[in-house]
């Protein structure tokens, strides 16, 4: 099993990152470099979280082995008469190798590759790719130029901060500049910035995640919040549609002014490809390609203005598409919550859906998750499950807050994480150590990463599921992950006293902390900021518990969901009305589809079968009778008189009623139903088809 656990986790984490990226990104529409860069950033960060428990168990085993090697083994001396025979007692090794043991020399190389690759991504490559993806240039050179200009200030800020650390080290006479110390300064600067963001996000997640599960057990609360989201999303949806209309109007003007032989026509064609299909068709119909451009007669937009317009088109189209998909998802969620509220009082104990699922369900799932099981889960078991999970997560949050405030105390050990790990270390229970480390890091990561997935900066950065996240937001999330994960793991090692700078013991460090270097170069960070700044998580948790941030945003005009607010009540009522309209609209659509399906099943097959039989097997009696009638009429009848001809012409000009089951619907009553044919004539049905089903 040597190294097998490491290989299995490397493969598993890759597919986990790929699955999450597929949920939020779009592999078909987004650029391959964006997908690869984001996947690599997420993959490396998840690797740190999953592999660190193996590093901890391996380090504990190496410490035990080192302590056993330094201790002198007892010897049994047997003296008989004049001859003294010294027989050493058999050495009993008190340590046993863990199942996930990683050989020496592998972990330091692994951590160096993972850490420095992630730092290269977050500080150099991903910011450049972010500006490149957001650029509206029409060529690779133009996009690279724009990205370099936008990142000049960005990179200059980093150089300024790093230069300040260099000056501090150079002025300090006790320190001598070496490559390892310069490397430590860079790592300290990156971890300081990451720890600053980490505490802010952690303080929010420690309270909000348990509270969200507790509120998840309240059906009325979730339904009201969904109505509130519907009202806000409808406003955003209308704003996105209006913004798209304005941008498309500008594109139409540019498209009409720049003709086919203009030098900038290729740029306009590139912009048109980014527009929705219906707008492309409208602009194509209104385009007159036979007019030559006259540079002296008209004023044409410059290439710089087209670049700006291209950027606006990309953003507006993405935002419009995202709001449309989110609106459909929110409707399904609202309909589901309303169904749960109705089924709670059901006496049959069977869950009944108002609308059928748009996606066909698996037969295996339908067999086990039948309406009865669904009713017991949704109406009885799920609320209690959410409450239990909320209590467990609240206990974890209290343990984290207590440990963050007391992890610097070594005598006595007050950090609960350190107490649990040290108890397991005495018995060398490696399975328990790895499980405890993984659950602790996983909970901290969930609190931080879930906040990253939830934050929303003025619609500029937003992670949306169902493949609706744009390239800029994906790259920005990769940058945040790479900046937050290393300080998160260092903070966890400090909570468990596996970091020698916290425990103040001369013990073998983990391979992860060994690549970070000694923080004694920057004592004010190692002994000050790293220890006392995490205590602010208490203040942030209190502020989150009392929703101080939500109240401040509400006062600034950004409506947030608050139960005791008049604005919230108004938005809830508005959202409820919107959901009711959409529900009524969908019901009418389903009723129309059901009516058409019933007419088609009742009359469509009979008509097809009778028509097929009539054409393939004609009745001989009918054919003989028709031939006889034709011969008799042609033989004994002369030309019709004027009265009969007039009556026949009137009958021919009259509109026959169309009783076709496929076309006799509510839609056929509309003036543009498609029944009118070019030339001013309507479709009519022959007498054989009309009376066929009688």
UniProtKB/Swiss-Prot annotation:
InterPro entries noted in UniProt: GPCR-associated_LMBR1, LMBR1-like_membr_prot
One protein family per Pfam: LMBR1
Main location: membrane
Gene Ontology BP terms: adrenergic receptor signaling pathway
GO cellular component entries: plasma membrane
Extracellular face residues: 1-3, 54-105, 172-186, 409-432, 495-521
Cytoplasmic side: 22-32, 127-150, 208-387, 454-473, 543-694
Coiled coil ranges: 228-260, 571-603
Polar residues composition bias: residue spans: 625-638
Keywords for this protein: Cell membrane, Coiled coil, Glycoprotein, Membrane, Phosphoprotein, Transmembrane, Transmembrane helix
Localization terms from the record: Cell membrane
Region listing for Disordered, in residue ranges: 582-638, 653-680
UniProt biased composition (Basic and acidic residues): 588-624
Membrane topology value: Multi-pass membrane protein
Glycosylation site positions: 78
Record flagged with keyword Cell membrane: yes
Biological role stated in the UniProt entry: Recruited to ligand-activated beta-2 adrenergic receptor/ADRB2, it negatively regulates the adrenergic receptor signaling pathway. May also regulate other G-protein coupled receptors including type-1 angiotensin II receptor/AGTR1.
Family: Belongs to the LIMR family.
Protein name: G-protein coupled receptor-associated protein LMBRD2
Source lineage: Eukaryota, Metazoa, Chordata, Craniata, Vertebrata
């Amino acid at each position: 099993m040597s190294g097998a656990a490491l290989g299995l986790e490397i493969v598993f984490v890759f597919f986990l990152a790929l699955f999450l990226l597929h949920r939020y990104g779009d592999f078909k529409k987004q650029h391959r470099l964006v997908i690869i860069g984001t996947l690599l950033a997420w993959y490396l960060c998840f690797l740190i979280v999953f592999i660190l428990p193996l590093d901890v168990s391996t380090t504990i085993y190496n410490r035990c082995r080192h302590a056993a090697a330094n201790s002198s083994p007892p010897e049994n001396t047997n003296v008989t008469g004049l001859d003294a025979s010294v027989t050493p007692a058999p050495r009993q090794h008190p340590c046993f190798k863990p199942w996930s043991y990683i050989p020496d020399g592998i972990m330091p190389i692994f951590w160096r590759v993972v850490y420095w690759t992630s730092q290269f991504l977050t500080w150099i490559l991903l910011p450049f790719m972010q500006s490149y993806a957001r650029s509206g240039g029409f060529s690779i050179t133009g996009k690279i130029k724009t990205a370099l200009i936008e990142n000049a200030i960005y990179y200059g800020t980093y150089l300024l901060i790093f230069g300040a650390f260099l000056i501090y080290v150079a002025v300090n006479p006790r320190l001598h500049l070496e490559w390892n110390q310069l490397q430590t300064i860079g790592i300290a600067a990156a971890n300081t910035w990451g720890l600053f963001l980490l505490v802010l996000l952690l303080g929010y997640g420690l309270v909000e995640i348990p509270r969200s599960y507790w509120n998840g057990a309240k059906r009325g609360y979730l339904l009201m919040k969904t109505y509130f989201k519907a009202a806000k999303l409808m406003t955003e949806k209308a704003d996105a549609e209006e913004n798209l209309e304005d941008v498309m109007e500008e594109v139409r003007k540019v498209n009409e002014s720049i003709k086919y032989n203009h030098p900038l026509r290729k740029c306009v064609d590139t912009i048109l490809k980014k527009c929705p299909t219906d707008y492309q068709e409208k602009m194509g119909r209104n385009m007159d390609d036979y007019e030559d451009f006259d540079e002296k007669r008209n004023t044409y937009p410059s290439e710089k203005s087209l670049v700006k317009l291209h950027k606006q088109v990309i953003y507006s189209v993405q935002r419009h598409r995202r709001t449309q998909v989110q609106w459909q998802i929110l409707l399904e969620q609202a309909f589901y919550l309303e169904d749960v509220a109705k089924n709670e009082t059901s006496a049959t104990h069977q869950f009944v859906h108002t609308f059928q699922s748009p996606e066909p369900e698996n037969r295996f799932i339908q067999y086990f998750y039948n309406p009865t099981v669904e009713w017991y889960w949704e109406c009885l078991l799920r609320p209690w499950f959410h409450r239990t999970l909320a209590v467990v997560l609240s206990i974890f949050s209290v343990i984290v807050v207590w440990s963050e405030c007391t992890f610097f105390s070594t005598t006595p050990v007050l950090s609960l994480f350190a107490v649990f790990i040290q108890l397991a270390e005495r018995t060398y229970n490696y399975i328990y150590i790895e499980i405890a480390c993984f659950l602790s890091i996983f909970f901290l990561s969930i609190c931080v990463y879930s906040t990253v997935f939830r934050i929303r900066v003025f619609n500029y950065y937003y992670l949306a599921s169902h493949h609706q996240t744009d390239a800029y937001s994906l790259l920005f999330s990769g940058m945040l992950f790479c900046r937050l994960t290393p300080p998160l793991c260092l903070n966890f090692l400090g909570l468990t006293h596996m970091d020698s700078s916290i425990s103040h013991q001369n013990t073998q460090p983990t391979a992860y902390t060994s690549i970070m270097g000694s923080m004694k170069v920057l004592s004010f960070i190692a002994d000050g900021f790293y220890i006392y700044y995490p205590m602010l998580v208490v203040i942030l948790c209190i502020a989150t518990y009392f929703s101080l941030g939500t109240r401040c945003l509400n006062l600034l005009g950004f409506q947030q969901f608050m139960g005791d607010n008049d604005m919230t009540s108004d938005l809830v009522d508005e959202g409820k009305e919107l959901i009711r309209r959409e529900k009524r609209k969908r019901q009418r659509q389903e009723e129309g589809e059901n009516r058409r399906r019933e007419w088609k099943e009742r009359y469509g097959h009979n008509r097809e079968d009778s028509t097929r039989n009539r054409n393939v097997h004609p009745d001989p009696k009918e054919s003989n009778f028709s031939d006889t009638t034709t011969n008799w009429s042609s033989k004994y009848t002369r030309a019709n008189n004027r009265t009969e001809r007039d009556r026949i012409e009137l009958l021919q000009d009259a509109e026959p009623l169309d009783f076709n089951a496929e076309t006799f619907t509510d839609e056929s009553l509309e003036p543009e139903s498609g029944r009118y044919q070019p030339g001013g004539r309507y479709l009519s049905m022959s007498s054989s088809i009309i009376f066929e089903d009688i």
